[in-house]
Amino acid sequence: MIPIIVLIGRTNVGKSTLFNVLTKTRDALVANYPGITRDRQYGYCKLQSNKKIILIDTAGLDIKLNEIEKQAQAQTLIAIKEAHLILFLVNARDGLMPQEYEISKNIRKYQKKTILVINKIDGINEASKINEFYSLGFEKIQKISASHNQGINTLINRYLIPWISEKFKKKITENLYKDTELKKIAIKVAFIGRPNVGKSTLINGILKEERMITSNTPGTTLDSISTPIKYNYENYTLIDTAGASKKKKKINDFQRFSIIKTLQTIEKSNVILLIIDASLQTCHQDLSLADFIIHSGKGIVVVVNKCDLFNSVELKKIKELIKSKLKFLYFSKIHFISALYKKGIFQLFKSIKESYEDSKRKISTSTLIRTMHIAIKKHQPPIIKGRRIKLKYAHLGSSNPPKIIIHGNQVKYLSLPYKRYLINFFYKTLKIKGTPIQIQFKDNENPYVKNKN
């Protein structure tokens, strides 16, 4: 299970700044689904030793005292329920505010481990302003300045990493099996998408039975359901994001799309089917989900459903538009299907298997070095301070997803366009399909530089 940490506090205490520092900003996924507060953001945070957490940034709680409980239930208390750890942020410059007593009361109701984070300590000389926060009664307290990156490492090393190590002792790795055993393992396929795009209908079509409840109401499915299946002698586990049992008649509290369950499903899967509604085409949520899947390093296959609603002329325009918007997923197959009429659904398995096998592929060092040299010959790295950046050799750092390590001189000066060029070249030359690849650049240190007097 991946740890979940939520940031809560009033407006302007620096939650979003800390969120961006920890997630490196670009990992954020904005939740814009029915029933979910738009101000809540979800992101991955990678700590030292490759410890990964899900971080939630919530809306500010700047409201009247008699409305706190009502408003918090609408946006922040749901996040608190989902979280394993709470980072309660306060603003040192403002001092202790009445709302923070109310927020702390709400936190204690759920008996979640909490760290009080006193932010914006830069330029503060009044010790009394900071000391008054101790009256909130939290044992774990850390002073930081998120905007100046001050105290962040202490927060991580003193509190977050020890907490993760203690609470999540069991480490789940996908590399426990030898290559010869991979065929015996079921490929875990997650069906991800916005509410009502046809995830359950697609699984029902594959299973040829009504295993999932389907309806036109967004948010019908509440808990993830895993279903084993064998197709063409290969074992698969189909995971529907958040499903509902027939016993559940009320969906009052959860007419919402569970981002947390989606992210957890992505984490435990091998290949992700990103399902898009052709009638709605692509929107910000689809693009955000796609970006999140790429950052998670999982294989991805794009499935555009409900194509039966359009004639051939309309469908051609939709295909062109969707391919244009998803051009950053050039390494992934895009399938246009009708889950309702079972058109094109079994062609998905070929792409799923390709994606899975390519994510596990072992690429030799000689192949990577040769590919790198061909790329350099066609397009040389830029010249920095009169010297051309040199890329010397490459090797595979890890698989699932494939991670290529390139060593050279001055590689820290490589531009983003040139890095993209190399990634695209490796994709094309190595014919990698359906899985993101990562490239890490390492500067070769000159052993004589450190010995200079």
UniProtKB/Swiss-Prot annotation:
GTP 2 binds at residues 193-200, 240-244, 305-308. Pfam families: KH_dom-like, MMR_HSR1. GTPase that plays an essential role in the late steps of ribosome biogenesis. One of its GO terms (molecular function) is GTP binding. The gene is der. GTP 1 binds at residues 9-16, 57-61, 119-122. This is GTPase Der. Associates with the 50S ribosomal subunit. InterPro entries: G_ENGA, GTP-bd, GTPase_Der, KH_dom-like, KH_dom-like_a/b, P-loop_NTPase, Small_GTP-bd. It comes from the Bacteria. Residues 3-167, 187-360 form the EngA-type G domain.
